């Protein structure tokens, strides 16, 4: 390890810790939705709208930094980001506690604030890690994204234990606790050297810039498809196991969601230690995702379907970070703008796929042909709908296989 690498070790750890601490933004609110419904009388529709607000805010931040990157100081923004997370979570907890009649306004305000921080996290943490001197930058990127999964598991376990031991009436104390963790990120970033980051890609000529832009567009398509393949199962694994496989909810949550997350984290850490040949990894990941979705939907054996659902976490684990690694390999010094655009593509995939799966499931379950098929197969229309939804989700990695093959040919031709 050279001197330059050593001097930035603290910076790398700051990025790792920040990704870990930021996971509370995504995993804590859903754990509290039932509490908010019972204590404040907020409908599930309005609570679900908070998830949409979270996504739309992050996407807005991604797009702002895609088109207006030059107006922002990346180092100041990076140091301010954890403070926004803390502020958002404190607002999320304080306004409903102090003004119960304004609870939903507090939840919306807090969600907007910490979602801005989440968007900034997506835009700036990856290029910061990529800009650090390293002997294995692709492994550092994989490790960064694996820590998000560990963060989710940690938040779920600690929060569930807290609410069970102390009661849901103290949810605001739990939220305040998670709000304190990002302060450590702020301290680390303020006391660590930050690398210079290109705001936009540097091109030698107009023709070269055109090739880079097309290559970046292909990477955005790839991360959209990869994110869709991962998040369709992430959002539906528990419901699918409960409705289509008739497993108890606790099994769907523990053996489903938790095992899915654990395999996702494990695969990313394995790549962080041993990884290479990212294009091949992405190709086999897409193929594996197609097989897992089809087996989960079509297998007549519950155990096989359950294993396929869980294994989706392993095979899709590298599709998001792996596409970032691919972009960094093929487009040197891509700039913060490129990372913002990639984050926007990933966020779109994370939103579109679960929504499409839900729409397909509802429409198929309500159809006449599904009712007739359900009778002949001794299933319910809802089961048929869920299985068709899973088959539909397999379309994303199917297209992804073609996209990866095209990307491989494109960069081989234009390298």
Regions found by a protein language model. Give the residues of each.
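Helix-loop-helix hairpin linking two adjacent transmembrane segments in secondary transporters
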Residues: 135-136, 143-197
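Intracellular juxtamembrane helix-capping segments at the cytosolic ends
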Residues: 120-133, 318-332
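Cytoplasmic helix-loop-helix junction between adjacent transmembrane helices
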Residues: 110-146
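Extracytoplasmic gate region of multi-pass secondary transporters
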Residues: 29-31, 212-266
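Helix-to-loop junctions at the C-terminal end of transmembrane segments
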Residues: 61-76, 163, 266-279, 361
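Symmetry-related core transmembrane helices of the 12-TM Major Facilitator Superfamily/SLC fold
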Residues: 172-190, 387-406
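C-terminal transmembrane helical hairpin of 12-TM major facilitator-type secondary transporters
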Residues: 278-326
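C-terminal ends and interior cores of transmembrane alpha-helices
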Residues: 83-101, 288-300
């Amino acid at each position: 390890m050279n001197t330059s690498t050593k001097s930035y070790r603290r910076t790398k750890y700051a990025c790792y810790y920040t990704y870990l601490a930021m996971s509370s933004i995504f995993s804590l609110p859903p754990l509290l939705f039932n509490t908010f419904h019972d204590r404040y009388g907020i409908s599930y529709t309005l609570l679900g709208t908070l998830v949409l607000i979270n996504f739309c805010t992050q996407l807005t931040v991604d797009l702002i930094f895609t088109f207006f990157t030059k107006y922002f100081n990346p180092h100041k923004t990076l140091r301010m980001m954890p403070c926004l997370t803390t502020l958002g979570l404190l607002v999320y907890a304080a306004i409903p506690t102090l003004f119960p009649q304004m609870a939903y306004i507090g939840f919306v305000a807090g969600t907007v604030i910490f979602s801005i921080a989440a968007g900034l996290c997506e835009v700036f943490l990856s290029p910061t890690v990529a800009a650090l001197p390293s002997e294995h930058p692709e492994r550092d990127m994989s490790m960064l994204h694996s820590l998000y999964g560990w963060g989710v598991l940690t938040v779920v376990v600690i929060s569930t234990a807290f609410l069970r031991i102390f009661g849901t009436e103290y949810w605001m104390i739990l939220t305040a606790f998670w709000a304190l963790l990002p302060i450590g990120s702020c301290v680390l970033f303020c006391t660590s050297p930050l690398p210079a980051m290109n705001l936009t890609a540097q091109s030698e000529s107009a023709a070269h810039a055109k090739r880079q832009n097309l290559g970046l567009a292909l990477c955005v398509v790839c991360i959209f498809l990869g994110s869709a393949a991962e998040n369709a199962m992430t959002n539906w694994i528990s419901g699918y196991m409960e409705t289509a496989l008739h497993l108890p909810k606790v099994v769907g949550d523990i053996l489903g969601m938790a095992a899915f997350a654990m395999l996702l984290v494990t695969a990313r850490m394995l790549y962080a230690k041993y990884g290479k040949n990212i294009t091949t990894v992405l190709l086999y990941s897409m193929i594996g995702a197609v097989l897992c979705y089809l087996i989960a939907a079509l297998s007549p054996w519950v155990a096989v379907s359950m294993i396929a659902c869980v294994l989706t976490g392993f095979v899709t684990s590298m599709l998001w970070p792996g596409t970032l690694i691919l972009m960094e390999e093929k487009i040197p010094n891509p700039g913060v703008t490129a990372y913002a655009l990639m984050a926007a593509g990933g966020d779109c995939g994370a939103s579109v796929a679960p929504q499409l799966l839900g729409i397909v499931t509802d429409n198929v379950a309500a159809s006449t042909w599904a009712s007739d098929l359900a009778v002949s197969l001794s299933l319910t229309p809802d089961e048929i709908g869920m299985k068709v939804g899973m088959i539909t989700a397999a379309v994303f990695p199917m297209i992804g296989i073609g996209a990866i093959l095209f990307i491989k040919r494109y960069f081989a031709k234009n390298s």
